[in-house]
Amino acid sequence: MRSAMFLPVLFALQALCTSVGHAMQHYPAVWGHYDVCKSQIYTEEGLAWDYMACQPEATDMTEYLRVTLDPPNITCGDPPETYCALENPYMCNNECDAATEELAHPPELMFDIEGRNPTTFWQSTSWKKYPKPLQVNITLSWNKTIELTDDIVLTFESGRPEQMVLEKSLDYGRTWTPYQFYATDCLDAFTMEPKTANDLTQQTLLDIICTEDYSRGYVWKNDKTVRFEIKDRFALFAGPRLHNMASLYGQLDTTKNLRDFFTITDLRIRLLKPATGATMVDENNLSRYFYAISDIKVQGRCKCNLHANSCVFDKGKLGCECEHNTTGPDCSRCKKHYHGRAWSVGSYLPIPKGTANICIPSNHGPVPRVCDNAMLRCQNGGTCHHHQRCHCSPGFTGILCERARCQGPGDCDDQLSGQASLHHRPTGRHHTLTLVVFPLLFVSLC
């Protein structure tokens, strides 16, 4: 009778497990976030910490940057200026005045919340000094290493530039390398054959390309954006819908150049030539030519070397909240008194928990290599943890889980082979299903 009462619950749990399994198949990235740094486990000595590789969640990194323009007086409005529409040279009713809030277009409007009407945007001065080039450098600085997780997207309120370069720095702006070139004619502008991100392969992913996809004059709103395609590059390893994140994490873990490619401290947008409407420059109406950007999106996370799952913005600075006995803005060194072995970056492998590579106390002495996955295998279903300890399956004990755990006389008998066998003795107790054991039942069924 009692077992019959449990049947509906068991069937419901089985259905739930099945649906969870299907969800994991369709959205595999949910297990690949590495958002837990440690958890408590039971060992022979009692409760202990099990350490895992971890990283902060991805977020909108434009909330934490500092923007710099060069030349510094390139923003419109000082003195006030009237602009004409690129498509209609006779529509000259747009005014920029830095002294009037409603008419000003300062740089911070590239990072405010979009959706307001009218749209807010930064705007440069017009091309009044033609034929001298109208060029602007927009530098985004985080004073912290960050890892990009999604496409960089620039939305232009004006026509998209006819020539532009996106650059990155890994040393806080001391040196720069190009990420991508943009032009209406790549051969003419940069002596490069035009390509797209779809032309890249696993072998050429790190190549710097010039694309013509984002430099044509716009007619519709969707043609206002310029992208640097991060996800298309991820997809070369993770598949078109990023289902195989295990493959991507494996590549990032073992290929330093690949991981560095998606890591930055600064971005620089070099605007080299404004939109001209694919025609000759009208020297009689230079108020038509300028740059205007309404939005910049940079999605990423703090780089914490897989030693932290959170990052804080305090007193104008980003910093990792380090775990694993590490310290520093990037968790890139061991804490004081934790130099028992050299600091090491965490590892995504083995998936899904990775390897923490924690710093250990200085007086800990050399770390013995108790087990591995080759010669010194943990027995009876045990697992090797950081080469230092076997986590034994229930019912087994010993350095390599080689012995049965005996609870009392008669619980286990030594066999002639030197191995032990377990014997179950009925206790006569009756167990009822309660809310307390429900999560354990769910885990065991799944």
PLM segments and residue spans:
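Classical eukaryotic N-terminal signal peptides for Sec-dependent ER targeting/secretion
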Residues: M1-Q14
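Disordered, acidic Ser/Thr/Pro-rich linker "stalks" and the adjacent N-terminal cap
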Residues: R2, L16-T145, D185, A197-S247
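Exposed low-complexity, polar/acidic, P/S/T/G-rich flexible segments that act as propeptides
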Residues: H22, T149-T155, R259, I264-D266, ...
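A short beta-strand element within beta-rich, extracytoplasmic domains
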Residues: I146-G159, L166
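Single-pass alpha-helical transmembrane segments
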Residues: G428-C446
